[in-house]
Regions:
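Conserved alpha/beta cores of soluble small-molecule-handling proteins
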Residues: 4-142, 146-149, 172, 185-253
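Glycine- and Gly-Pro-enriched alpha-helical subdomains that act as flexible
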Residues: 141-142, 149-171, 177
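Feature captures the catalytic cores and cofactor-binding loops of soluble hydro-lyases/lyases
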Residues: 178-183
Length: 253
């Protein structure tokens, strides 16, 4: 299991929610009782401080510990924790100003699997998806689920804007419910933007006025082209800009 987050001036945005999600994942795997959440929080900040970082990218990984090679979890009750903090490097400014391209790929999410909602180091599907999108000349991959509905991107959640309303695939679509996704859903009503979690079809994506993706590292990026076709007017839209500004104000980024 792992969490990935960014710190702003030494403060990790919604670290408590990242750790709560980590705890839920640990419970799913039967190792939650051995998890010291308050100790992990202290360790994250100690790692940031030791590396003398203010704006940082953090990866916290927890395993069930050391054991014999098998399909059974170690029973020692002693978890292994690895924390990596490095300088936060965001995509180039033009990616935010002009948007990026995406392609719908064959690599898929499984909405029936409980693993879809668990943040882990199992990135093989995402690696395949990103490779397929690169082959198509795009920077990001849009992944469908086994029902042919839009799920998420390779390492990010996806939103569409249609007639001024905001939509994002529901958790039941086979997504990892991101902390930034959660923040956007909370911010939208305060901006007068109606937001809904629902099934999103490929046609909805193609007909959208705007599309944006989110995660804790990139924050919010506009998608302006899908499978070689412009999305909306082919440039970042006003709803995306308003949400991005509100998110930066929230994080202090």
């Amino acid at each position: 299991m792992c969490i990935r987050d960014s710190s702003y001036d030494g403060q990790v945005f919604r670290l408590d929610r990242h750790l709560s999600r980590l705890a839920r994942s640990a419970d799913m795997l039967g190792i939650g009782t051995a998890l010291d959440i308050s100790g992990l929080e202290r360790a994250v900040y100690d790692t940031i401080s030791a590396n003398e970082l203010s704006d940082a990218r953090i990866r916290l990984t927890v395993t069930a510990g050391v054991g014999e090679r098998s399909l059974s979890l170690p029973t020692s009750g002693s978890l292994t924790v690895i924390i990596v903090a490095e300088e936060l490097v965001l995509p180039l400014p033009q990616a935010y100003e002009n948007g990026i391209r995406a392609a719908i790929v064959g690599a898929a999410r499984n909405s029936r699997s409980p693993m879809s909602a668990l943040k882990s180091l199992g990135y093989l599907e995402s690696l395949m998806a990103r490779s397929q999108s690169a082959d198509a000349g795009a920077e990001e991959a849009v992944m469908l689920n086994e029902r042919g509905l839009v799920a998420e991107c390779s390492t990010s959640n996806i939103f569409i804007v249609a007639s001024g309303r905001l939509f994002t695939p529901s958790v039941e679509s086979g997504i990892l419910p991101g902390i930034t996704r959660e923040a956007v859903l909370e911010l939208a009503p305060g901006l007068g933007i109606e937001a809904s979690e629902c099934d999103v079809a490929v046609a909805d994506l193609l007909d959208a006025d705007e599309v944006l993706i989110t995660n804790s590292v990139i924050e919010m990026l506009p998608l302006v082209e899908l499978d070689g076709r412009p999305i909306g007017r082919g440039k970042p839209g006003e709803v995306t800009k308003r949400l991005s500004a509100a998110y930066k104000e929230l994080t202090g980024g």
